[in-house]
Amino acid sequence: MAVSLWQQCIGRLQDELPAQQFSMWIRPLQAEMDGDTLVLYAPNRFVLDWVREKYINIINQFFTEQMGSDAPKLRFDIGSRPSAKKFEPAPVATVRAPNTQTKATVGTYFNTQAEPIANANHRSNINPTYQFDNFVEGKSNQLGKAAALQVAENPGGAYNPLFLYGGTGLGKTHLLHAVGNGIIKNNPNAKVVYMHSERFVQDMVKALQNNAIEEFKRYYRSVDALFIDDIQFFANKDRSQEEFFHTFNALLEGNHQIILTSDRYPKEIDGVEDRLKSRFGWGLTVAIEPPELETRVAILMRKAQESGINLPDEVAFFIAKRLRSNVRELEGALNRVIANANFTGRPITIDFVREALRDLLALQEKLVTIDNIQKTVAEYYKIKMADMLSKRRSRSVARPRQVAMALSKELTNQSLPEIGDAFGGRDHTTVLHACRKIAQLREESHDIKEDYANLIRTLSS
């Protein structure tokens, strides 16, 4: 009875919570009765603590509404309910003896004649240097890291497939490798394959050329976990999409983990079949956004520490405030500073950094101005540039104006009064309100979150 009530509660939560929150925190929970107590199993401590803090009152309220004083007690535990199916390595397949007349090697990942596919090394290409421990977490990537951690602990479970999307250089590939390392640590025999989508296409083409398509299928469908980076490169490659469609289905039916990354939201990927885009969203879709200031500073400090360099706090903030687009750009700039310091023997100060990065900083200041932000936002929302400066308060105009103010605060070094002046002489408190409002809406509204991320990418590219 109580387990059935939990299913009703799930239905209520699904209606009330944003889809991403529901998928992230509620869907992984498993329920089982223990006497008069309903035990909710969370996959790890992170989820358990989050649900206790954020959702326990909603759950208890629902139970009380439905059963009054007969409502079951609640207890939380970590793990799976005893009846839950656990992750197992993929079964070893058998294949025919190789055709000795076939001489060509197909791709990098399997050979048409060297050895039976089942016994071949599934070359994972998992980079051991990419771990969760050295992934700098911030608000922009917190959900992505949490989801990746859960997949590493319970591959083939609730988040399957896991789809990570965001601009270049934001850490999506790092998370893929971290998951792979986590799975292999827990199960050294697991067959984990990481690749760029173009490698999948190249392997399939070579398999077709060498009449080895069956070996290709057996190889990819016998892995325990398949991670494909930059899935958007499947666009307009119909045969590759067809083969991946069947590979995807086979792996999912066997409860084997799939993680995909892209530079855009699944439904926005042009040239990919709708049936594939639909499947990309079956599990959990998480945005990886450009890092906020505090995370950018932490990334610089971590990188400097790894390089054995003492980076002053004020220098880290100086760089982080001016380079905002992605982690790769930050690390490249720091490497340049370190190289210059080693070459000249000069201490790393703000003046030294300003000189070492003068061309890069000049380019950034030229590209990101309040005027440029206003024009970009106006074009994005299809409003007139004059509306940015007007007193109109209709939502169709006011919301884009607030977005532009928030972007100006984040992407330029202008003060709140200066931003207000640029928006028709508004008071600095109006700008502050706009920034807070957009920050709130990015948490609550998927559309605003997407719009903001798209504009950041456009302005930072």
UniProtKB/Swiss-Prot annotation:
One of its GO terms (molecular function) is lipid binding. It is found in: Cytoplasm. Residues 1-84 are annotated as: Domain I, interacts with DnaA modulators. It holds the Pfam family Bac_DnaA_C. Residues 84-124 are annotated as: Domain II. Residues 125-341 are annotated as: Domain III, AAA+ region. Oligomerizes as a right-handed, spiral filament on DNA at oriC. This is Chromosomal replication initiator protein DnaA. It comes from Shewanella sp. (strain W3-18-1). The gene is dnaA.
